[in-house]
Every structure is written in C-alpha cells, then in structure tokens.
C-alpha cells in the first residue's frame, strides 16, 4: 500500500513533472509474470526513476544498513524502505547475501518484478563495475528472464557525495529479456 501511495500520489507525480524521464523499451517488461530487472547503479535516484517508468511494482534489494542505522535518520530510513517493500541485503559476502536471494525467489515465485544492481554498489565515477554472480544464480535457479536495464543521467540528478544535483531528464532503457539457461548443456 505504501509503495503505491509513493508511486502514484506522493513522490511519483512530482518526479514525473520535474524530471520527465525518457523511457525506451518498456515493452520488453512483461505485463504480468516474474522477471529480474538487472540495472546499472549510478546514484540513489536509480531505484526511484526505473520503477516510475513502469506500471508494475518493482521490489529491490537495499543495503542492510538502511534497515539498521541508529537514530532518527535510521528510524525514518527503516520505515521508508520497509514500508516500500524493499529487501535488506548483507553485502559483507556471498554467504551473507543468501537471505536476500531467498527473498528474491519468493518475490519471483509470486509473479512479481525484482530489481537488482549486479555491481552490488553505486558507481562513483559513472563506469560500470564488475558484476556479482547473484543475478545469474537467481535466473538459473528460477528460470526467470533477466531484463537488462540502463539508467542514464541519475548521476547528474543526484550526484554521489553531493546534496544537490542538476535538473536533467534521466533516461531508462530496457533491453530484450535474456534467458540465461539457453546454451547450457543438459
């Protein structure tokens, strides 16, 4: 409920009016059924603009610190991320992240969209970092297609390490779905 309130009433309309994001390839995202949206990660704004361009809900993994930070800021972060249905991920190592992958499987089993940043962190210089194996493992274990997503310009809207950015039109490009099981032997 909180997710839809944010997307269609509170934050979404403001972002659509102020930034007018450019969208390409949204038809590659299925109208129903599960899919993994694997995106680059340029800024905090990525997880706002990508779902904003789709009619369906997108659930993301978010670093566990957003759910455990002490103080008033931490309380607001926890309420916001929990209320919007995001999944905490412990990024300290592969075994620590298993809980998030299990949660992702449950989300995909329910026929939902799951968003993930294969790099595991935001890029501070705009370059694409080496991806982690979680996306491939998730796709192979579930048989769900991976839709590559390029989010563009959010590093200008919300630059890493700065409080304010520039008003520009961010872009979101969805690529055709990939079946990672193709080409694998029996």
Locate each region found by the language model.
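Alpha-helical membrane-targeting segments
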Residues: 1-20, 70-85, 163-167
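Helix-to-loop junction immediately C-terminal to a conserved catalytic motif
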Residues: 9-41
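Short gly/ser/thr-rich secondary-structure transition/capping motifs
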Residues: 16-23, 97-98, 154-156
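A cross-family acyltransferase "interaction/gating" segment
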Residues: 29, 124-186
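Catalytic core of membrane glycerolipid acyltransferases/transacylases, capturing the structured
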Residues: 31-94
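A short, acidic/glycine-rich surface segment
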Residues: 45-46, 67-72, 99, 155-162
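Hydrophobic/aromatic ligand-binding patch that stacks against planar heteroaromatic rings
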Residues: 49-50, 80, 106, 137-141
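Catalytic-site beta-strand/loop segments enriched in glycine and acidic/polar residues
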Residues: 105-135
């Amino acid at each position: 409920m909180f997710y839809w309130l944010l997307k269609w009433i509170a934050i979404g309309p403001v972002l659509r009016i102020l930034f007018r994001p450019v969208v390409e390839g949204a038809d590659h995202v299925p109208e129903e059924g599960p899919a993994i949206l694997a995106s680059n990660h340029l800024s905090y704004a990525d997880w706002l603009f990508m779902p904003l361009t789709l009619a369906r809900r997108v659930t993301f993994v978010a670093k566990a610190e957003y759910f455990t930070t002490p103080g008033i800021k931490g309380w607001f972060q926890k309420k916001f991320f929990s209320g919007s249905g995001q999944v905490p991920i412990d990024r300290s190592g592969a075994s620590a992240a298993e809980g998030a992958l299990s949660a992702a499987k449950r989300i995909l089993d329910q026929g939902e969209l799951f968003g993930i940043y294969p790099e595991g962190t935001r890029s501070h210089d705009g370059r694409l970092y080496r991806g982690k194996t979680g996306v491939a493992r998730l796709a192979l274990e579930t048989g769900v297609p991976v839709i590559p997503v390029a989010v563009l310009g959010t590093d200008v809207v919300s630059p890493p390490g700065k409080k304010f950015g520039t008003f520009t039109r961010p872009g979101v490009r969805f690529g055709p779905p990939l079946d990672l099981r193709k080409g694998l032997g029996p």
